[in-house]
Amino acid sequence: MAGSNGQNEGVENWEAQLRKGCLEMAVLAALAPGKSYGLEIIRTLEMHSKLVLSEGTIYPILNRLRQDSLVDAVWVESDSGHPRKYYSLTRKGRERAAQMAESWMEFAQGLSSLMEPLLSKKRGARV
């Protein structure tokens, strides 16, 4: 993503909006392999997508996904004695995640072909 000088402020704002728009899809995708708790979801997203989320961001998203019947949640005792709330996709959540993934891939492929000339020019300028 963009650097942090004043010249890139507009790009940074755009990137922040892009991340916000993708969070629900990213959380559903992070839950696709199986059940997970909040901090684990945060780590998964950071590792795979460079999305850095706080607990104050992830839990409202998870609650909204629960209200929309896209995820289920269950409290489970952990080895440390502190219960953890594990989230998993519902059937509806799996269907929604698959639809979002398909739409995203089509969108990203189209944009990639559109952006390629811009990237080629930038690469050529570095040589």
What are these regions (language model features)?
Residues 1-23, 100:
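Intrinsically disordered, low-complexity serine/threonine- and proline-rich regulatory segments
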Residues 3, 95-127:
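Amphipathic alpha-helical dimerization/coiled-coil segments
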Residues 15-59:
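N-terminal helix-turn-helix DNA-binding core of bacterial DNA-binding proteins
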Residues 50, 76-79:
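Short polar/acidic secondary-structure junctions
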Residues 59-66:
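Short, hydrophobic-biased segments on the C-terminal half of alpha helices
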Residues 69:
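Glycine-centered, phosphate/nucleic-acid-interacting loop/turn motifs that mediate DNA/RNA or nucleotide
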Residues 73:
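Short beta-strand "wing" residues that participate in macromolecule-binding interfaces
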Residues 79-101:
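Basic, amphipathic "hinge/linker" alpha-helix immediately C-terminal to the N-terminal HTH DNA-binding motif
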